[in-house]
A protein has these predicted regions:
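Membrane-interface extramembranous regions
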Residues: 2-143
Length: 143
């Protein structure tokens, strides 16, 4: 498979998002991030099971994007479906994160970088949408 500029965007974007999501999910297993995430979920009104589900979701999305990108040549027929599912899941995950940021009860000091406006989740959501767009363009060209 020849590397086109679109393929490179998809690959590098997937590696970045995968690393970002896995890292942040993994960090939430340790203090002080564990407590900060617990406060975010509790104050936003989401149920308690959202805490382990959120961590597992972030780590699995990250691993999905990283594994698809790293083993692209070996799993070429699975690359697009894995990146599609992980990117779509990331958009849902970041939609929930945006809602958490917008809850008035959630203090800024427990959010990433202490930033109350949802710049980070919206930026990540945009990058995940870029992945979906690149996959769509690639599929259109092949047919």
């Amino acid at each position: 498979m020849k590397q086109t500029p679109d393929n490179k965007i998809l690959k590098y974007n997937s590696v970045f998002l995968g690393t970002f999501m896995f890292s942040f999910g993994f960090l939430k297993l340790f203090e002080p991030f564990r407590t900060m995430f617990d406060v975010q979920i509790t104050k936003s009104g989401l149920p308690r099971f959202s805490i382990p589900m959120g961590i597992a979701g972030e780590m699995s999305i990250g691993l999905g994007l990283l594994s698809a990108s790293c083993f692209r040549q070996k799993i070429s027929n699975l690359f697009s479906p894995i990146v599609f599912v992980a990117s779509a899941g990331l958009i849902v995950n970041m939609g929930i994160a945006t809602c958490v940021h917008l809850q008035p009860e959630v203090p800024a000091n427990v959010l990433p970088l202490g930033i109350k406006p949802p710049f980070i989740p919206l930026s990540v959501m945009f990058l995940a949408a870029v992945n979906l767009f690149q996959l769509h363009r690639g599929n259109k060209r092949q047919s």
